[in-house]
């Protein structure tokens, strides 16, 4: 993927080899490895390959502006670009089907369908499980499939109404960024659990949503703040 993308004009390099200091307007591709390695190894269909293009803004902070999430085993590809919307391409037996990506209109946690992510680190996983337990009786269902890039896209296309993950690390950036652009361009919302913006050069907790249930959900998320997770690691 990197070799093919290298032929594209108007970008300044790759995220992992970018200089220590970047200038406003510079753009770098981040090519992800397999997102959902455990699913892949266990021959589940829910795994992806991802790519995201970052642009440094006037404040010298990076922001993803193009996102690609490809799930080969599912025959699904999500594409999104800043200001151009998001599209889902579904390969079927009779050809490709292209749909505009739009989130759900669910306006309450009651009867909603949520998804969440977990970590291989016990303290981080416990934080997610605590939130899921506290939500019992509100959503119609809470799913756990992964990976994060696909879960973000499923929030964007209305499969889920929201998703929460307690800790995403720097090695997750490609998948998070690609899925984030899909969410943004579908007019969904995405932030940290405390409502602050994502920091693209640091670890994050994340909560994308359809934008209609985020305040209700954050009431539960904020009962389990970031420092609790860090202290348990």
Named regions from a protein language model:
Residues 57-61, 92-97, 169, 226-229:
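Short helix-coil transition/hinge motifs at the ends and kinks of transmembrane helices
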Residues 20-23, 42, 59-61, 79, ...:
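Solvent-exposed alpha-helices and their adjacent loops that cap or buttress functional pockets
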Residues 61, 80-81, 94-107, 218:
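Short amphipathic beta-strand/extended segments with alternating polar/hydrophobic composition
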Residues 17, 32-35, 39, 151, ...:
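Acidic active-site catalytic centers that drive phospho-/nucleotidyl reactions
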Residues 1-35, 219-222, 226-233:
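N-terminal subdomain of lithium-sensitive/metallo-dependent phosphomonoesterases centered on the IMPase/IPPase/PAP
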Residues 101-233:
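An extended, acidic
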Residues 8-9, 60, 186:
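Helix C-cap/helix->beta junction micro-motif
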Residues 25-91:
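DPxDG-like acidic metal-binding loop motif
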């Amino acid at each position: 993927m990197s070799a093919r993308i290298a032929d594209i004009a108007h970008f300044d390099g790759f995220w992992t080899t970018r200089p220590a200091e970047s200038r406003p307007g510079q753009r770098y591709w981040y090519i992800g490895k397999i997102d959902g390695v455990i699913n892949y190894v266990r021959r589940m269909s829910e795994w992806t390959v991802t790519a995201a293009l970052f642009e440094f803004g006037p404040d010298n902070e990076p922001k993803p502006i193009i996102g690609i999430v490809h799930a080969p085993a599912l025959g699904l590809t999500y594409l999104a670009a800043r200001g151009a919307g998001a599209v889902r391409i579904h390969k079927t037996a009779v050809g490709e089907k292209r749909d505009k990506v739009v989130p759900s209109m669910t306006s309450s946690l009651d009867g909603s369908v949520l998804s969440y992510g977990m970590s291989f680190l016990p303290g981080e996983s416990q934080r997610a499980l605590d939130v899921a337990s506290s939500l019992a009786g509100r959503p119609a269902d809470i799913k756990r499939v992964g990976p994060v890039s696909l879960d973000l896209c499923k929030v964007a296309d209305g499969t889920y109404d929201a998703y929460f993950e307690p800790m995403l690390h720097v090695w997750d950036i490609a998948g998070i960024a690609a899925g984030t652009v899909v969410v943004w361009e579908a007019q969904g919302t995405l932030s940290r659990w405390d409502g602050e913006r994502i920091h693209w050069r640091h670890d994050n907790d994340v909560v994308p949503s359809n934008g209609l249930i985020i305040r209700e959900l954050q009431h539960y998320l904020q009962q389990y703040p970031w420092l609790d997770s860090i202290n348990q690691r």
